[in-house]
Amino acid sequence: MEIASAAIAGFGYPEHPVWLPPSAASGSRFPLQLIANQPATRLHSQLDFGATSQASKIKDREPVRIHPRDAAARGIGDGDIVQLYNDRGACLAAAVLSDALRPGVIQLSTGTWYDPGDPAADKPMCVHGNPNVLTRDAGTSRLAQGCSGQLTSVEIERFEGPLPPVKAFDPPP
């Protein structure tokens, strides 16, 4: 059996997948691989304001899972508010130590409502925990345009200073 599409063939795209090397943001400056998966507590960003999603948050922030070894190396404890960052942006989240992840990998679900701490800042920082400020704004291929959220390298550190309030659910003035 052979499946073909004349319409797709007409696009002139390569017939086979190709290897896309990691972006320039990876490496020693940003040694952790971010998994930005679909959330278990809401449907994408729908119902982020709902009881199930809100109950999963820590100090009003989305949980980020991190291996205990990576957390210890950075002075991060369970429940600490942390800042994830790379050259694209930053976001705040709450650390959850987990042996379910390999060292060098952290996991922060997508779908948290974007809440810019300072909308005028050169580099965006979401105070609520949306990983989209860290990922490339590029689809996985010219055909699929899928999420490239699994191709993101970051660093993480304890957040110091006053914790900004989450205003994502506040109505406009």
What are the residue ranges of the model-derived segments?
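Long, contiguous, secondary-structure-rich segments that constitute the structural scaffold
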Residues: F49-R65, R69-P173
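Long, low-complexity segments enriched in small/aliphatic residues
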Residues: M1-T52
